[in-house]
Amino acid sequence: MYLNTISPSRGSKHLSKRVGRGIGSGLGKTGGRGHKGQKSRSGGKVRLGFEGGQTPLYRRLPKFGFISRKAMVTQEIRLSDLSRVSDKVIDLNVLKTYNIISRKIKFVKIIMSGEIKRPITIRKLRVSKGARAAIQSIGGQIEE
């Protein structure tokens, strides 16, 4: 066997159909598109959700819900995330400087997930009941 004799196995490669190249090819003239109509034209596609002029499903159903603007600037952080902070007092700006939260976040709630090893002081952040108990049990404080 030589490199110049290697070829793909029979039937593993499909040749692309050459359309519009004469009657004998079987794909001449209309090129497999049929006669007339929107789909036979160049660029002839119907938009997504179009139902032929019938009121489409997305307009037949009522509107619902909304996107809370406050949710975009609110974040929950785990108790274990606070172990990355070396400061004794933790507030919103400290969390931003340690890249625990992004700059756009304005409201933070600390939730009970993971554990914390050293006493810390939480200032002006919301804290869940479980996280509050965990922080206070090791001698930490929560200032409102």
From Swiss-Prot:
UniProt cross-references to NCBIfam families, sorted A to Z: rplO_bact
InterPro entries: Ribosomal_uL15, Ribosomal_uL15/eL18, Ribosomal_uL15/eL18_sf, Ribosomal_uL15_bac-type
Annotated Polar residues bias: 1-10
Biased composition (Basic residues): 11-20, 32-44
Gene Ontology CC annotations of this record: cytosolic large ribosomal subunit
Name of the protein: Large ribosomal subunit protein uL15
GO molecular function: rRNA binding; structural constituent of ribosome
Compositionally biased region (Gly residues): 21-31
Domain of life: Bacteria
GO process annotations (BP): translation
Record key words, sorted: Ribonucleoprotein, Ribosomal protein, RNA-binding, rRNA-binding
A Pfam family assignment: Ribosomal_L27A
Record's subunit section: Part of the 50S ribosomal subunit.
Role, per record: Binds to the 23S rRNA.
Start and end residues of each stretch annotated as Disordered: 1-51
Family stated for the protein in its record: Belongs to the universal ribosomal protein uL15 family.
Organism of origin: Blochmanniella pennsylvanica (strain BPEN)
